Design a protein with these regions (language model features):
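Conserved glycine-rich beta-strand-loop-beta hairpin in the small C-terminal domain of fold type I
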Residues: 279, 295-303, 313-325, 356
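Conserved core segment of the aminotransferase class I/II
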Residues: 222-296, 382
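Conserved PLP-anchoring active-site segment centered on the Schiff-base-forming lysine
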Residues: 109-134
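Active-site phosphate-binding strand-loop segment of PLP-dependent enzymes
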Residues: 142-217
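N-terminal small-domain helix-loop-helix segment of the aminotransferase-like
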Residues: 2-98, 105, 281-283, 289, ...
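A short helix->loop->beta-strand "cap" motif at the edges of active sites that frequently abuts
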Residues: 118, 197-201, 226-227
Length: 382
């Protein structure tokens, strides 16, 4: 049967394996406290759900691929309030069905093998969707390691200039999943300069931009030049709206125009009632502050027990994740399996890339009381 060989090369999505192991433990009657997947367990704010319901009409046709003008305006207004960046909602913003599908398909928009632009650069450990989308699009992929000694930032000086010249797009993700690291504006400025020198695009996945605990992170949109830069963001983590599938791409007018041409062939914007809910979400900050406070309380519970058990937390300045060094040099999957036997699910760092070995990721998605239960388990097991 003619199936893509990429399917075999990539293998099973690692978190599918984690789900299978979790089900086996639950079947034994063990209470499972799931810190494995980054799917917020908090309810979506009532006013957002009301906006969703109010947006449902008797007849709902296909949504416009470019999204409602009001949604593009709400996104542009949020970017200006949050980052001090003025965007043209007609030329520099396009809504998407969350961030995942847009990230996955982006390589199809930017690869140009006839010009030698056949390389996609990503980072690891990290969210695997950009890499997988690039491989399905036929690209070669270069993954830059994010190492603790470099502050979990890519070492751009280690890349051969010949590879930069082949790059169609360079992906970064800050605040970073899984390390929780944030990036200085200087990183984006350097990438934009390299992009101008070597003719590639910079794509910044900023899905965790609003989950921070000290200082609000900067955005790549704040770089002085956006001609070769686009940002992907989403309401999934910011507003606990993972199931709504609502996000956006913003930045380079030329790239946004290319997406306007491409996207009607592969999908559309979110349904109109989801867009109405999204307008409400992007227009409000109160529910986001409340979410940060909840995550902060859960974070404090785990930080306390991990510190008492001398488990070192690395990075973890933002996002909903704690990036924890595995004690005693134990392999990350073995350590995660040991915790799972006691009902605490964490993601082995090796699932997220070779440089993730030696760490595990705690996603702060269980309720605060469940975090306290997990802390008691960790107190006994570690």
């Amino acid at each position: 049967m003619p199936l893509s060989p990429i399917l075999d090369e990539l293998g099973t999505y690692p978190f599918a394996r984690l789900d299978e192991a979790k089900r086996r433990v639950a079947a034994r009657g063990v209470r499972v406290l799931d810190f494995g997947m980054g799917d917020p367990g908090e309810p979506t704010a009532a006013f957002i759900r009301e906006a969703l319901a109010d947006g449902i009409r008797e007849t709902m046709g296909y949504p416009r691929a470019h999204g409602l003008p009001e949604l593009r305006q709400a996104i542009a207004a949020w970017c200006e309030r949050r980052f001090g960046v003025a965007l043209d909602p007609e030329r520099e913003v396009i809504p998407t069905l969350g961030a995942k599908e847009a990230i996955f398909s982006f390589a199809q928009v930017v690869l140009d093998p006839d010009r030698g632009k056949d390389l996609v650069v990503t980072t690891e450990p990290g969210y695997p969707v950009a890499e997988r989308g690039a491989r399905f699009a036929g690209a070669e992929v270069l993954q830059l390691p994010l190492l603790e000694r470099n502050g979990f930032l890519p070492d751009l000086d280690a890349v051969d200039p010949a590879l930069w010249r082949r790059a169609a797009v360079v992906w970064v993700n800050y605040p970073n999943n899984p390390t929780g690291a944030t990036a200085p504006l200087a990183l984006y400025e350097r990438l934009v300069a390299l992009a101008a020198e070597h003719d590639f695009l910079v794509a910044s996945d900023e899905a965790y931009s609003e989950l921070w605990f000290d200082e609000p992170p900067v955005s790549a949109l704040q770089a002085p030049e956006r001609t070769r830069l686009v940002v992907f963001n989403s309401l999934s983590k910011r507003s606990s709206m993972t199931g709504y599938r609502s996000g956006f791409v913003a930045g380079s007018p030329e790239v946004i125009n290319a997406l306007r041409v491409f996207r009607p062939s592969v999908g559309t914007a979110p349904q109109e009632f989801v867009q109405r809910a999204s307008i409400a979400a992007w227009s409000d900050e109160g529910h986001v502050r409340e979410a940060r406070e909840r995550y902060g309380r859960k974070r404090a519970v785990l930080l306390d027990v991990l510190a008492r058990k001398t488990c070192r937390v690395a990075g973890s300045r933002a996002t909903m994740y704690l990036w924890v060094e595995v004690p005693g040099g134990e392999p990350s999957d073995a350590f995660a399996a040991r915790l799972l036997e006691h009902g605490v699910v964490v993601a082995p760092g090796s699932y997220l890339g070779p440089s993730g070995e030696g760490y595990v990721r705690f996603a702060l998605v269980p309720a605060e009381e469940e975090c306290r239960l997990a802390a008691r388990v960790l107190e006994e097991v570690l």
